[in-house]
Amino acid sequence: MKKTLFLLVLFSFVFAAAGVWAGGQQDAESEDEQSNLIYIITPSHDNPFFKTEAVAAEDEAEKLGYQTRVLSHDDDANLQDQQFGNAIAAGAAAIICDNAGADASIGPIRRAKEAGIPTFLIDREINETGLAVSQIVSNNYQGAVIGGEKFVELMGESGKYVELVGKESDTNAGIRSKGYHEVIDQYPDLEMVARQSANWSQTEAYSKMESIIQANPDIKGVICGNDTMAMGAMAALKTADMGDVIVVGFDGSNDVRDSILAGDIKATVLQTCAYNARLAVQQADKYIKTGSTGAPEKQLTDCVLIDKANADKLDNFVLSE
Amino acid sequence: MVHKALSYIIHTFILMICLLIAGSCTVVRHDQQTESEEDELSIYFDNGEFDAKLYVESVWEEAVLPRIKEEAVEAEVLFESLNSDPSTAIEKYGYRIEVTAPYNFMVKGSAIITQANVKSAAATISIDANGPDGKPVEIQIGPVIKGTAVRDSMDFIHFEDFTNQLEFANISREMNNHIKATILASLKREELVGAKIRYLGAFQWVEGEGVLITPVDLVVEE
């Protein structure tokens, strides 16, 4: 049933694409007009982070006079392959993508390039240069380091703690974990008693945290690879009457902002995802019009620490001055 | 008109055949993850091909130190300038690697150590200098050294020259390790307060915050 539905969806996409393609062909015959369609492909919009970057990219593209097609690959590299295929078939002007894997995404980006369609990556980078026109990379490592430093400070440099890691297939899960440990492991009195993946999920973080608490009732802190897991962990801790345990997240969502303001979660790390998405669209526009973005392919944007001091200035992943 | 309709039908027909072929193939997922044991999450992104330590050793004497020696501004001049006219100071002395990052400054000076903050593993010494906005000025003495001020002051180290952000991050880590091993290892940590020092280093400046210098040279004068 699922497969049938999937095929139906696929069919409809391809036909839609075919329509645009055929239309494009006819236009090309008549007046050699350029494509005006930008594909925006990101992970699932269930996570407000990805929704924000998709909406920002869409808004910026429409402001610049483009039509958009917004898709989610749900961190499935095969689905991403098909979506790139659609964009190629549709003769898109550009693809804006938060990719589904540092290695798995190399193939489709190369095919798009060969078909003359430039790709602009946001948030996550790929392990190859010379394929995408821009890689506007959120410096997750730097973000994890400042989050880790805040966590160490809140812990008073000692005590037992737990780490909740994100989805393993996601590059940033590894990068953030490595950044945290780069800092925390330099402090001999901080002891990690459990380290588990909760796959970026709030419910999974809740249930994993519940069982971790059973075995380790004396934990002092929990450091999480993203905000949804931090929310899950905080909820489990509060249920167990352990609301004073230090929880630190990553992303800068409004949920965690509110939790920080309420005194529950202590800190998170903001990625400037809306800024990055708009920058990518602006560079795509410039590239389409002039053949160059004027910027290097790989561009790094820093993350910002959010705690009680600045949480009230945060809204939808944008920190007001 | 007839020609266009015909072309449309032919395109659709070709696509349908393609789909039939595609439909008969088995789609194999290539992003499958093997379940790993607790505490053994693999970080495949870091393939270990790049030796950051070797890289830092190769540029330290030839490029890092010469640049900081050349570009460093006398502390009193720099702090006064940041205090009175930050935008001019930034334009004149600041360097940053990208638009969302804070500016880095290279600095040198002589000072008296007023306090040794050695309770934390990220230990620092406070010096008798007036930071911008009257904020304190500290120098990191480790063992934990925070930040990436030294790497980010280098105009010859560009993110795009490295495979990914981990390699880029490892450069900063190895620079800080190099500083610990060469400059800070011989520091007599019990006899710091009251001592006169000469220092050379870099810091990342955020307006309204104190100055935290990562030293690349630190000499206690007899």
Summary of predicted features, one role per range:
Chain B
Residues 1-25:
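Sec-dependent bacterial lipoprotein signal peptides
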Residues 25-222:
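OB-fold and OB-like single-stranded nucleic-acid-recognition modules
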